[in-house]
Amino acid sequence: YLDHGLGAPAPYPDPLEPKREVCELNPDCDELADHIGFQEAYRRFYGPV
């Protein structure tokens, strides 16, 4: 393993990240996600994840 000064390797991209951002931009979805989790909140507002 060689360290080229780039820091830690990038984590795998989250395939749900775009949907997570949509939910976070909706105050109601964001609030519900705090209580029941993002995937369930997204499903209630927008349909299947």
UniProtKB/Swiss-Prot annotation:
Post-translational modification: Gamma-carboxyglutamic acid residues are formed by vitamin K dependent carboxylation. These residues are essential for the binding of calcium.
GO biological process: biomineral tissue development; bone development; brain development; cellular response to insulin stimulus; cognition; glucose homeostasis; learning or memory; negative regulation of bone development
Binding sites annotated in the UniProt record for Ca(2+) 3: 24, 30
Keyword Transferase in annotation: no
GO MF annotation list: calcium ion binding; hormone activity; hydroxyapatite binding; structural constituent of bone
The keyword Metal-binding is assigned to this record: yes
InterPro entries listed in its UniProt record: GLA-like_dom_SF, GLA_domain, Osteocalcin, Osteocalcin/MGP
Keyword annotations: Biomineralization, Calcium, Disulfide bond, Extinct organism protein, Gamma-carboxyglutamic acid, Hormone, Hydroxylation, Metal-binding, Secreted
GO CC entries: cytoplasm; extracellular region
UniProt binding sites for Ca(2+) 2: 21, 24
Modification sites for Hydroxyproline: 9
Positions of the Gla domain: 1-47
Subcellular location, record wording: Secreted
Disulfide bond entries: 23-29
Residues given in the record as Ca(2+) 1 binding sites: 17
Extra facts: Sequence data obtained by MS from permafrost fossilized bones about 55.6 thousand years old.
Function: The carboxylated form is one of the main organic components of the bone matrix, which constitutes 1-2% of the total bone protein: it acts as a negative regulator of bone formation and is required to limit bone formation without impairing bone resorption or mineralization. The carboxylated form binds strongly to apatite and calcium. The uncarboxylated form acts as a hormone secreted by osteoblasts, which regulates different cellular processes, such as energy metabolism, male fertility and brain development. Regulates of energy metabolism by acting as a hormone favoring pancreatic beta-cell proliferation, insulin secretion and sensitivity and energy expenditure.
Protein name: Osteocalcin
Taxonomic source organism: Bison priscus
